[in-house]
Each structure stands twice: as C-alpha cells, then as structure tokens.
Amino acid sequence: MDDDRARELLARERDRIEQALAVRRDDPLEGDDRIEPGDEGSEDLYQDTFDAARIADLDEELAAVERAEARLAAGTYGLSIESGSPIPDARLEAVPAAERTVEEQERFDR
C-alpha cells in the first residue's frame, strides 16, 4: 500500500475514533450539583459502566492508530510487528492500524 493511501485510511480512522470519544465524553449532566448520587438509577449506573468501557476501548484504538502512524513515519507500516511479514493490503483497508497478519492476530488473541 502506498504511503498516501495509508495516511488517508489512518486519518479517517483517527477521525472516527475521536468523534466517538467526543460523543461518549460529552455528558451534559457532568458537574451538575443538583443531581444527587442516590437519584441515579441502576440503569444510569449500567450506562456509565458501559460508557467507561467503551471509552477505554476507543482509547486503545486511538493508541493503535498512533502506533501505525509512527510505523508509517519509520517506513515499517504494513509489516507485521511480530514477524516482519507483509500485511495484505485488503487487511489494511479493513483495519488500517493492523499490527499483525490475520493468522498472527488469531494466535495473539488466544
């Protein structure tokens, strides 16, 4: 994959993640002293827990994009961090921040 295409894909991925983070972090009730902790129902607690987990996932996705951008700058984007093998362009199109081939990722995730 050429560098311009990689930059475009990574920029789009960064934008998607940053927009999702902005939505998750934009809580209009945050800091509202009129709401007592006991007023929040269990549904709110569940949603807060879900949002915190989603924010953590998005933060990790953003970190992966930043690592991919660093690899692009270093000239190693598109090569597996595990084996140095080329990551197929189709995988990079689908997952621009991919760090491993599909097979390596499956082993890593086990």
Predicted regions and their residues:
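Interaction interfaces in information-processing and related assembly proteins
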Residues: 1-74, 94, 103, 110
